[in-house]
């Protein structure tokens, strides 16, 4: 190796672009951990998504001193690319479903974005409420950022979600699980590359709802998705509940700056 250059690795990992003496380039993620399996969830996710979409190739993982590491192929990127192709690609991913016909996943996410692996439910409504919303709520309560007024609106929002789900059939699709604009990029040919997954099997509207929380997806993305795998009637009413989950995740992780957004969304859903 002749060069190690720090690059953005998200809010959890240290990340480096490595260049070797023969000019090969690699992407290295590192995180303090006592387990060589720290990145197992991401590895499995990349392997699953890579059967349908372009993703970084997993080259090696293990321990380096007191840090877990994950070595990936390096993909040169550019800021703009084919969002229509991105939408179609996500639609193709969502067409893949769980082998057992249930909702969940079987590998832990050590970064805390999801629940423990090995949790499966026969219905999406119960999985989403128990393993997503309620988990986030407990974390927020432990940080003393959950008020009585928020809880009253939350209970009404959950009842509203249950009512909407009575007329919607959920299929356990393969999901990225954390699909905001920081988790895709475009290669040198302007083609989409999917990164940093937290995969599980769930209703595909979950991923689409998350895309709408922060900027980064344009109309071409949604058109591409609809052309590949049209969303079911009434999806506009259901997407805000997945936005609520994602904002609750950020409130529990990053603190007070997201409380106002959660409160406003709860008011609109109650």
Regions found by a protein language model. Give the residues of each.
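ATP/Mg2+ or Mg2+-diphosphate-binding catalytic cores
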Residues: 250-270
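An alpha-helical support segment within catalytic cores of ATP-dependent transferases
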Residues: 98-174
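Short helix/strand-capping connector loops at secondary-structure junctions
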Residues: 241-250
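Active-site Asp-x-Gly
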Residues: 117-129, 138, 171-174, 181, ...
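Short, solvent-exposed loop/turn segments at secondary-structure junctions
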Residues: 33-34, 63-66, 75-77, 133, ...
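ATP-binding pocket architecture of kinase catalytic cores
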Residues: 5-126
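A general structural signal marking secondary-structure boundaries and capping sites
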Residues: 53, 94-101, 140, 165, ...
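Juxta-kinase regulatory segment immediately upstream of eukaryotic protein kinase catalytic domains
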Residues: 1-3
């Amino acid at each position: 190796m002749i060069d190690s250059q720090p690059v953005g690795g998200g809010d959890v990992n240290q990340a480096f672009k490595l260049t070797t003496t023969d000019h090969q380039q690699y992407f290295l993620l590192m995180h303090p951990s006592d387990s060589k399996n720290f990145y197992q969830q991401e590895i499995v996710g990349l392997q699953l998504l890579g059967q349908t979409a372009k993703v970084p190739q997993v080259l090696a993982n293990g321990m380096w001193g007191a840090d877990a590491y994950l070595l990936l192929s390096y993909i040169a990127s550019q800021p703009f690319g084919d969002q229509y192709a991105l939408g179609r690609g996500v639609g193709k991913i969502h067409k893949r479903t769980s082998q057992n016909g249930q909702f969940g996943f079987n590998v832990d996410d050590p970064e805390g974005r999801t629940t423990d692996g090995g949790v499966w439910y026969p219905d999406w409504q119960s999985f989403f409420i128990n393993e997503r919303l309620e988990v986030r709520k407990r974390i927020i309560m432990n940080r003393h950022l959950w008020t009585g007024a928020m809880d009253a609106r939350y209970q009404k929002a959950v009842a509203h979600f249950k009512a909407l789900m009575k007329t919607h059939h959920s299929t356990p699709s393969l999901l990225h699980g954390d699909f905001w604009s920081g988790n895709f990029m475009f290669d040198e040919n302007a083609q989409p590359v999917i990164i940093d997954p937290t995969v599980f099997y769930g209703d595909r509207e979950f991923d689409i709802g998350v895309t709408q929380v922060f900027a980064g997806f344009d109309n071409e993305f949604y058109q591409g998705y609809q052309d590949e795998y049209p969303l079911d009637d009434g999806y506009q009413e259901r997407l805000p509940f997945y936005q609520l989950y994602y904002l609750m995740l950020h409130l529990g992780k990053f603190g007070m700056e997201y409380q106002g957004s959660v409160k406003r969304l709860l008011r609109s859903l109650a």
